[in-house]
């Protein structure tokens, strides 16, 4: 809560715990022409790809230890562009593929033996993500509309699922007797 200003105390609230990860988005690119390495099996209907290269910043960390089930990202920009990007991510992505080395094939959910393709999801619509408290007798849609008009930026978060692959497990360095882990990976969001 804030100190009172003209007798009014403001309450501040977050809907989710913040996880700070030792990661950096090193590069993000969008391509209409797909140039996947040999051995990559793309889903049928792919027309473009959004590639996000992530760097692991901590020498002690491993990908398996820092990557959550989903990587929550905030879409920042001009409102109409954010809207189009959110639509593309949450409605047009066919799969999230991982590339551990620059010239190696992209690994899809099929090649990893996962039961279904991974797709980004919208954040901010669940009851446990509410910013405003409403009477339980009120319809959830009323809360969502109120929050959308009062806090539209709250809905600019997207969870990008990260496939768990064996190549991301490894030792932090060669000194501990293991194989050195790759310090960068690329997530390829293939779009229809």
Sequence positions of predicted segments:
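Intrinsically disordered, low-complexity, polar/charged repeat-rich segments
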Residues: 1-192
């Amino acid at each position: 809560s804030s100190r009172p200003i003209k007798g009014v105390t403001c309450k501040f609230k977050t809907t989710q715990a913040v996880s700070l990860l030792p990661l950096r988005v090193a590069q993000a690119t969008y391509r209409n022409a797909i140039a996947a390495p040999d051995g990559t099996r793309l889903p049928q209907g792919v027309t473009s790809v959004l590639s996000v290269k992530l760097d692991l910043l901590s020498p002690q960390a491993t990908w398996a230890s820092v990557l959550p089930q989903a990587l929550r990202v905030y879409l920042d920009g001009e409102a109409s562009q954010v809207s189009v990007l959110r639509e593309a991510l949450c409605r047009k992505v066919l799969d999230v593929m991982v590339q551990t080395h620059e010239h190696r094939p992209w690994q899809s959910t099929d090649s990893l033996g996962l039961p279904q393709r991974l797709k980004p999801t919208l954040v901010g619509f669940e009851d446990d993500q509410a910013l405003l408290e409403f009477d339980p007798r009120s319809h959830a849609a009323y809360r969502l509309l109120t929050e959308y008009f009062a806090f539209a930026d709250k809905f600019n978060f997207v969870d990008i699922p990260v496939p768990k692959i064996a190549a991301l497990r490894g030792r932090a360095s060669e000194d501990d007797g293991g194989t050195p882990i790759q310090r960068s990976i690329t997530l390829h969001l293939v779009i229809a």
